[in-house]
Amino acid sequence: MANNEVIENTWLERPSPEVAPELIGCTLVRRISEEKIIRSTIVETEAYAPGDPACHAYRKRTPRNTVMFGPPGISYVFLIYGMYHCLNVVTDIDGIPSVVLIRALQLESVPNWLWEHIPKQKSKPKVSRLAAGPGKLCRLLNIDLNLNGSRLRAGQPMWLEQRSPSFEKNLQIVQTTRIGITKGTNLLWRWYLANCDAVSK
């Protein structure tokens, strides 16, 4: 997977429902160390924004959700069920709680060192399903609360890159309702790459 233009904070200074579909096809780069860098394509996203009852900041600002308020271009990582981490990209202007949840990634290949993060199974799992879900991708890429509030910038533990021109030509995105929530279920704020095996559901 070739390197593309790094996404700057200014590109993210928009409401999450605008940014989320445009992140489909972009690259998430995870730098664990100088020798361990993994690149994967974002294939599924969800938006959470002000006025949305499913948004963590719907009622008020708290120590847990304060990262959601910006600035744009940082990561918001939270823990659910006491065991699964979820990675979000903070968007919009500073002070507005707006994020894009990264729901699934597509890996082109899996380096040998990455298999150590994959639970042992009777049969080798499909590469397309390794990051098919927010909890799965965080476990695979070693993303946890230590990365909450970290800057998404080249050379940092994580950053984002724009879609490649070739990917852009054949891009087909499906828009639908979000999953795994009980409020705001009518909002069409989930997007995923059509006909992609790496999508969570």
Curated annotation (Swiss-Prot):
<dbReference type="Pfam" id="PF02245">
    <property type="entry name" value="Pur_DNA_glyco"/>
</dbReference>
<protein>
    <recommendedName>
        <fullName>Putative 3-methyladenine DNA glycosylase</fullName>
        <ecNumber>3.2.2.-</ecNumber>
    </recommendedName>
</protein>
<dbReference type="GO" id="GO:0003905">
    <property type="term" value="F:alkylbase DNA N-glycosylase activity"/>
</dbReference>
<dbReference type="GO" id="GO:0003677">
    <property type="term" value="F:DNA binding"/>
</dbReference>
<keyword id="KW-0227">DNA damage</keyword>
<keyword id="KW-0378">Hydrolase</keyword>
<dbReference type="InterPro" id="IPR003180">
    <property type="entry name" value="MPG"/>
</dbReference>
<dbReference type="GO" id="GO:0006284">
    <property type="term" value="P:base-excision repair"/>
</dbReference>
<dbReference type="InterPro" id="IPR011034">
    <property type="entry name" value="Formyl_transferase-like_C_sf"/>
</dbReference>
<keyword id="KW-0234">DNA repair</keyword>
<comment type="similarity">
    <text>Belongs to the DNA glycosylase MPG family.</text>
</comment>
<dbReference type="InterPro" id="IPR036995">
    <property type="entry name" value="MPG_sf"/>
</dbReference>
